[in-house]
Regions:
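C-terminal soluble interaction/assembly domains
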Residues: 239-327
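Secretory-pathway/luminal and periplasmic proteins that interact with or process carbohydrate-rich
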Residues: 57-64, 124-133, 145-149, 165-171, ...
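Substrate-binding/active-site groove segments that recognize
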Residues: 134-143, 156, 181-196, 217
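Bacterial N-terminal signal peptides
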Residues: 6-17
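Sec/Tat signal peptide C-region and signal peptidase I cleavage site
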Residues: 18-24
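An acidic, Gly/Ser/Thr/Pro-rich helix-cap/linker signature
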Residues: 24-106
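Short, functionally critical alpha-helical segments immediately adjacent to catalytic or ligand/cofactor-binding
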Residues: 38, 49-57, 110-127, 159-162, ...
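Acidic, glycine-anchored loop motifs typical of Ca2+
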Residues: 198-206
Length: 327
């Protein structure tokens, strides 16, 4: 009877362990296939092994990728979470602390200093939290998982290329569970396209070299169409029962509907305090993040550049609000 009981335990253990062993074998086979593709990208065996030699799927990464938030923040809740007085005060201090280098970078790329610091503050709290995940391992997990494997496989190969170029070591390549890296939280593809070696040391170090971080942020925004003659937009007030061209406000709050600022002014749109809109005449569009009963904004082309960085209206408005506190 005891032998039979032990046999049952052993059988159960084999059944439980079997899928794990199979998964591990499949992952190693997948890595072998990836190695060949990495070779074609110029990645050496030494870098591949240093980055992925001990890699295995990270359970927590899968959990985070598949988890759904229990609730959705309202715009006001999100704004209060991201744009605090403490963060604004710290941003103002950073503007003064790094004024010289920020001024140089701002002039070269045509991006206002306050926006560079704002992105830095929102992304990583001014470099204080970069993420603790091993980026190659996290990306390998997501690429192997299969939900968005093609995207993350490309990002993993990009990460290996960054390592091959010597910008960072595998052990130092830390970031978010999804692979966003450094103080600017660039995905590897964004790093390869936009990261800047400002100090000329041969490394585009967005992890530890602040001038590289600032220049990379500014260059990204420049390539996204930033115009330093404009701000991001402004909060506005609408007249009661507002319509324009026979359309109500919610219908007008469409990315495709853009009008010169003075046309909005002629239709009765005013600044949030009731004053007239500026006399400048950039193209603007309505954004109403909380619907008809919430706040209303007129945003300019720079707002779209922010959306290029992060596609959330909440995020872009938070960037705008925090930057306004640094004027």
């Amino acid at each position: 009877m005891v032998r039979y009981f032990l046999f049952l335990i052993a059988t159960a253990m084999l059944i439980a362990v079997g899928p794990v062993i199979a998964q591990a074998d499949n992952f190693q086979s997948w890595l072998t296939d990836l190695r060949g593709e990495a070779h074609q990208r110029g990645v050496s065996d030494a870098i591949f092994d240093a980055a992925l030699g001990d890699a295995k799927p990270i359970k927590r990464v899968i959990e985070l990728d598949r988890s759904q938030p229990e609730f959705t923040l309202t715009f006001d809740e999100y704004l209060n979470k991201i744009v605090s007085k403490t963060r604004a005060q710290k941003a103002a201090q950073k503007l003064v602390e790094h004024d010289e280098i920020l001024t140089e970078i701002s002039k070269k790329y045509g991006v206002q200093k306050r926006f560079i610091v704002t992105f830095w503050g929102v992304e990583t709290n001014f470099g204080q939290y970069l993420g603790s995940f091993n980026v190659p391992h996290a990306l390998a997990t997501l690429a192997y998982d299969g939900r968005r494997s093609a995207y993350f496989r490309k990002e993993l190969l990009n990460a290996l290329q960054i390592l091959e170029e010597g910008h960072i070591t595998p052990s130092q390549m830390k970031g978010s569970w999804a692979g966003a890296m450094g103080q600017s939280q660039f995905m590897p593809s964004s790093f390869l396209s936009y990261a800047v070696d400002w100090n000329g040391d041969g490394k585009r170090d967005i992890w530890g070299t602040k001038p590289d971080v600032f220049a990379s942020t500014a260059y990204y925004l420049k390539k996204a169409g930033w115009n330093d003659q404009l701000t991001w937009g402004r909060r506005v007030s609408l007249p009661d029962n507002f319509t324009m061209d026979g359309k109500d406000a919610m219908t007008l709050a469409d990315k495709k509907i853009r009008k010169n600022l003075q046309l909005w002014a002629a239709a009765g749109v005013r600044s949030a305090d009731g004053s007239l809109l500026p006399k400048a005449n950039p193209v603007a569009r309505l954004v109403m993040p909380s619907g008809a009963k919430g706040p209303t904004f007129l945003v300019y082309s720079n707002f779209d550049s922010i959306l290029d960085w992060n596609r959330s209206n909440y995020y872009a408005l938070a960037i705008g609000h925090l930057s306004d506190m640094l004027k």
